[in-house]
Amino acid sequence: MKLSEQWLREWVNPPVDTEKLTAQLTMAGLEVDSVKPAARTLEKVVVGEVIAREKHPDADRLSVCRVDVGEDEPLEIVCGAPNVRTGLKVAVVLVGGVVGDLKVKKTKLRGVVSNGMICSEREMGLSEQHEGIMELPADAPIGKNIQEYLTLDDYILDIELTPNRGDCASVRGIAREVGAINRLPIKGPNLVTVSATINDVFPVEVKAEKACPRYIGRVIRGVDSHSQTPLWICERLRRSGLRTIHPVVDVMNYVMLELGQPLHAFDLSRLVEGIEVRFAKADEKITLIDETEIALTERMLVIADKSRPQALAGIMGGANSAVNEKTEAIFLESAYFSPGEIALTARHYDMQTDSSYRFERGVDFKLQTLAMERATELLIQITGGSPGPLIEVCSETHLPKIPRIILRPERIKRLLGIEINEDEVSKLLELLGMRVVKEKNNWVVTVPSHRFDIKEEADLIEELAHLYGYDRIPQLRMEGEYTIAPFSETQLSSARLRCLMTDRGYHEAVTYSFVNDELQTLLNPEVTSIALSNPLTAEMNVMRTSLWPGLIQVLKYNQARQTHRIRLFEIGMCFNAAGNEWQQVTKLGGLVAGDAHSLQWAEKGRRVDFYDVKGDLSALFTLTRTEAHFRFAEGHHPALHPGQSAALYYKDQCIGYLGALHPELVDQLELTAAPFLFEMELNAIKTSILPKYHPLSKFPSIRRDIAIVVDRDVPVGNIEEEIKSTAGQLLIITQVFDIYESGKHIEFGKKSVALGLTFQDPSRTLIDGEVKQIIERVLAALERKFNAKLRA
């Protein structure tokens, strides 16, 4: 944000120079990116009036001008600007004068002597405007030093605001900070309430109260659109990086820079029946004041009349109702819009205006009436006109709530390492406009409406620190007790899990904890998301409940760049709402897409399948040395393909899911192929058991193969569990080596499962009879539970 130092000092004028002032702002967290003079070096530059203009006798593009600069005789000056004309007030550099690095001398141009130079804004360092010479107001005093006339003994401060300090996007906001730092009150203009002189009102209906909790309007008739914007407003706009457009628009911009409240003016004659603040309808379009036509979606907030959208709320007005030189009646708008709604629209259309810049960061929700009165006052002074009464529509329930925060002295000492006198704490906070009440040993602080970045105790302590002065905080040796956390050999570290995943060809991803609500709901409509009150962007408006939204976004990013074989994993926190509480759960998730292996000459390529990913998870479970307690079972997740998914269980607890992304979601997300996803609670796989020594058996093992026929829908995992529980400790290995579902000798709806069972006793040699008895018990158990038949 750019602003004039002179303008700032009208609000608060601390006894410090420019260098000290910028240092104070930077230490307060408002980093001053640059400090530049308001103009280049100017010597012997005065106001002049062109009293005669003739065409140069030997050059079509040059003019010979006689210019009155307040001396005995007019000067003859050769000028090449297309806008030079008789009666124009201009900036003239006299012979011997200096503009920047240029010293002006008497010169002969195509045979005509030029006794000076008429300047453009660019030559004087005022702006990049160079199409013609600078045109001064008609009442500019001839012979007046231009530096004094334009008050150019000034500096332009360019302040880099962080997203949380939207309250400082105005001269008033910066003045509040400077005043607090220097213990000075701020002055500013005398803001008055303008009485209505006509009874004209224009109907306003707010249909989107959550997106626009407060809307104030006013009709002003009899506006003179040909009036001249005062030079002091023009200069302040220029030094803030804005150009003059129209007296009404200039006043809107000036009040925005002064107070921080964006305003908009509609040509009242172009509005039909009334104002509606609503979301756009399907297939609606709007042509903006920059002549850009955009197609609106139903998520976009607009200001409309009864016929069409007339403005993109909080961002830019429409061309249809823009004020122009024929405008005689206007409807002024001063509103509070939800930061998230404005951010959503601005990001969607890749637009950032001075208005959206402020609304996205947050505007004081109590400022709208004040800004309306200030704009009305200036408009009547400059353009004339008769104002009507204020029209206000407000939904108090949807306005931001002002927090009351308890501040504890012990917390101040813990965070800053010092004790601050109780009276000083109260005074410092009151300098920031806060209401402070002492209750017992604590302070109860009510935050002003413009400080929407202060939400908790730590925020107050941060404000105390920069007002108290970081240079007053002594350097102390850190003291404290550090207890070494006990290390358990049964705890698997996250680093070990990461190593295994990378060993199996995965790349670790780190995605944002903030995700898009629409994508998260698409993947799991049953989940309740935690909404952010002030999201960084409209696409990151809720806390994630799963790692999958972030991983899918990474997949889309890579597929758009022709990378199709992707193996990703992530370990991160997820946040689940549970009533009025919320829970943090650390999860391990992954995504696999594309070919199972990199292309090679010795093996034909194939797509990754369910069992590839299942094998990776089985390897992960093996790390715990309790892999027998993990199982893959039937389970439903709305994001996964019902025929290619499974629930992950540890003992009897569901810890996650694995499967292919649902085909409908693949289409909606415009993915090239369905990826496989998995996710589980990290704590379920972080506990291992200590290995115990078991000597290898000296005695031979016996393997018996069996093939049973069961119903097709019987899970093989259930069969394995039943075999293990029935066979006892002599069974050391169970291996499925064949599944046959169709063909000769197999009934429809049945399948054949072949298993290899290996038996061994560590203390003796088993005999066939013992193994035969175990096999018979196993077959009997399988028949009872699954109606399994031994295949002939």
From Swiss-Prot:
Keywords: Aminoacyl-tRNA synthetase, ATP-binding, Cytoplasm, Ligase, Magnesium, Metal-binding, Nucleotide-binding, Protein biosynthesis, RNA-binding, tRNA-binding. Its EC number is 6.1.1.20. InterPro entries: aa-tRNA-synth_II/BPL/LPL, B3/B4_tRNA-bd, DNA-bd_dom_put_sf, Fdx_antiC-bd, Fdx_antiC-bd_sf, NA-bd_OB-fold, Phe-tRNA-ligase_IIc_bsu, Phe-tRNA-ligase_IIc_bsu_bact. Residues 697-791 form the FDX-ACB domain. Its cofactor is Mg(2+). The keyword Magnesium applies. One of its GO terms (biological process) is phenylalanyl-tRNA aminoacylation. Residues 400-475 form the B5 domain. Binds 2 magnesium ions per tetramer. Tetramer of two alpha and two beta subunits. Belongs to the phenylalanyl-tRNA synthetase beta subunit family. Type 1 subfamily. This is Phenylalanine--tRNA ligase beta subunit. It comes from Coxiella burnetii (strain RSA 493 / Nine Mile phase I).
